[in-house]
Swiss-Prot record:
GTP binds at residues 35-42, 62-66, 80-83, 147-150, 180-182. It comes from Tolumonas auensis (strain DSM 9187 / NBRC 110442 / TA 4). Residues 27-201 form the EngB-type G domain. Keywords: Cell cycle, Cell division, GTP-binding, Magnesium, Metal-binding, Nucleotide-binding, Septation. GO terms for molecular function: GTP binding; metal ion binding. One of its GO terms (biological process) is division septum assembly. This is Probable GTP-binding protein EngB. Mg(2+) binds at residues 42, 64. SUPFAM superfamilies: P-loop containing nucleoside triphosphate hydrolases. It comes from the Bacteria. Its cofactor is Mg(2+). CDD domains: YihA_EngB (cd01876). Necessary for normal cell division and for the maintenance of normal septation. Gene3D superfamilies: P-loop containing nucleotide triphosphate hydrolases (3.40.50.300).
Length: 212
């Protein structure tokens, strides 16, 4: 039976927090979006939700270095994590951001999946691999979105997708890789299907036995 598709246009902003200790109660299901500062994360979120200003695009690092929570339905949250990889920020600030990302990915009980965005022309940088390792160690479902797919012709695009799929096999079979273009809408329907499935509550042992 196919999972009903969720309406991501209903997503609305809830709160921002500098770290895990300032987030709301750790219940329900969260799916987080993360990526380097130039990976097109804000544009992807806006395309998925069809809300142009949901994730404000900013070239100023300080404006986007908070954990931003949005609610889709009661108990179903979408999380916009701080972008990483800025070149023009002090090392102390970089380390602080990385610590906040690591803590959230490894300690947030309601976190079920990570959507990791990478520019299709420059995938799998060091910090991307670190994020994949943290998410894999936390047994999260992982969706790698290769953004700006419109920048490549179909042949090279398919080649990169296949290369990244092969490279991420080391992180287990919970990793999916898809091409994505906010400009052309490529991948939006597939992301909607995947996330709708991941937002479904898992059956508990009691529920399974009752069904039998």
């Amino acid at each position: 039976m196919d999972t009903p598709l969720l309406n991501f246009r209903k997503v609305h902003f809830v709160t921002s927090a500098p770290d895990i200790r300032h987030l709301p109660n750790d219940g329900g299901i969260e799916i987080a979006f993360a990526g380097r500062s130039n990976a097109g994360k804000s544009s992807a979120l806006n395309a998925l939700t069809q809300q142009r200003q949901l994730a404000r695009t900013s070239k100023t690092p300080g404006r986007t270095q908070l954990i931003n929570l949005f609610e889709l339905e009661p108990g179903k949250r979408l999380v916009d994590l701080p972008g990483y990889g800025y070149a023009q920020v002090p090392i102390e600030m970089k380390l602080k951001w990385q610590a906040a990302l690591s803590e959230y990915l490894q300690k947030r009980e309601s976190l079920k999946a990570l959507v990791l965005l990478m520019d299709i022309r420059h995938p799998l940088k060091d910090l991307d691999l670190q994020m994949l390792e943290w998410a894999s160690n936390s047994d999260l479902n992982i969706l790698v979105l290769l953004t700006k797919a419109d920048k490549l012709n179909p042949g090279p695009r398919k080649t990169v997708v296949q290369q990244v799929r092969k490279a991420t096999m080391v992180f287990g079979d919970s990793v999916r890789v898809e091409a994505f273009s906010s400009l052309k809408g490529t991948g939006v329907d597939e992301v909607t299907r995947i996330l709708s499935d991941w937002y479904q509550p898992e059956d508990t042992p009691d529920e399974i036995s009752e069904a039998e």
